[in-house]
Regions:
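Generic hydrophobic transmembrane alpha-helix motif, especially the helices
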Residues: 57-60, 65-68, 77, 90-124
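Transmembrane-helix boundary motif in ABC transporter permease subunits
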Residues: 21-24, 39-49, 61-90
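N-terminal, non-cleaved signal-anchor transmembrane helix
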Residues: 1-56, 63, 230-243
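Short cytoplasmic-facing helical segments at TM-TM junctions of multi-pass membrane proteins
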Residues: 128-173, 200
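Alpha-helical membrane-interface segments at transmembrane helix boundaries
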Residues: 1-8, 48-56, 60, 83-86, ...
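Glycine-rich helix-loop "coupling/hinge" segments at transmembrane-helix boundaries
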Residues: 107, 136, 181-222, 238-243
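Membrane-spanning helices that line or support transport/gating and their immediate boundary helices
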Residues: 50-54, 74, 84-88, 131, ...
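Transmembrane alpha-helices
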Residues: 118, 122, 154-188, 210, ...
Length: 243
């Protein structure tokens, strides 16, 4: 796939530099140093290519989950009946064992990256919906009333008041979506992905503790970097909007 080829074609020094600069922008010196060291570990471990495939699969799945989940979350936040229906739906999704998601997608699409993405999207969809709905519902009613009195239309109210104020909460939902996507990618190694999850699975079948530990740490470090950057950006938005 073109996106996958693009990720694999980027030289690792460029990727490390860009992500470190992003970390510095949101979290300043400490976060940038932490990010640089964690990325260097992945490079030194020799698993950079598999890490980039993991980032590609996780990133693509999270984007799809957010495209589906955030609008549904907005709808749930504005409509009580939709909120009840979607809450029941995502509660059901979250109670299913992770292996269950693989059964229907393998039957329909066989094995491969696309199958893995569908399973990951289904597994990671819940936080995108839940946190967005929570962010929309928790906006101060006085701000809504003031906006309506000022003459805001419903469209302006949504895009200029509700969404900006709910954005820190939405970012935390994206953060949780990334965490769930990464955890599911280890399971989707069973359907033929060639990422860090496959490395963990191979290590498990061969009882190779060292190999499994290094691959597991690489997955954990990707999660830590994403978590720290998103939380830092969310905190900055809270300060900006006085939340």
């Amino acid at each position: 796939m073109p996106i996958k080829k693009f990720f694999l074609a980027i030289p690792w020094p460029w990727t490390v530099t860009i992500i470190t600069i992003i970390a510095w922008h949101y979290g300043k010196f400490k976060l940038s140093i932490l990010t640089f060291l964690l990325l260097r570990f992945i490079v030194i471990s020799g698993l950079w290519t598999k890490a980039m495939i993991t980032i590609y699969l996780c990133g693509s799945s999270v984007v799809i989950a957010c495209i589906i989940g955030i609008p549904l979350g907005i709808f749930a936040g504005l409509n009580k009946k939709a909120d009840r229906v979607l809450t029941a739906f995502i509660d059901t999704l979250q109670t299913l064992p992770s292996f269950v998601y693989l059964i229907p997608v393998v039957m329909l699409f066989r094995v491969g990256d696309f199958t893995a993405m569908i399973a990951v999207v289904l597994y990671a969809l819940a936080p995108a919906i839940r946190y967005t709905a929570l962010g929309i519902k928790n906006i101060n009613s006085e701000l809504i009333e003031a906006s309506l009195i000022s003459g805001c239309t419903e469209r302006q109210l949504l895009f200029k008041v509700r969404l900006p104020l709910a954005l820190p909460q939405i970012l935390l939902g994206i953060n949780q979506t990334i965490m769930l996507a990464l955890s599911m990618l280890v399971i989707t190694a069973l359907v033929g992905t060639r990422d860090l999850g496959q490395e963990v699975y191979i290590a498990l079948t061969k009882a190779d503790i060292g190999r499994g530990l290094v691959a597991g740490l690489c997955v954990a470090f990707i999660a830590i970097i994403a978590d720290k950057i998103i939380v830092a950006s969310s905190n900055r938005l809270k300060i900006k909007y006085g939340l």
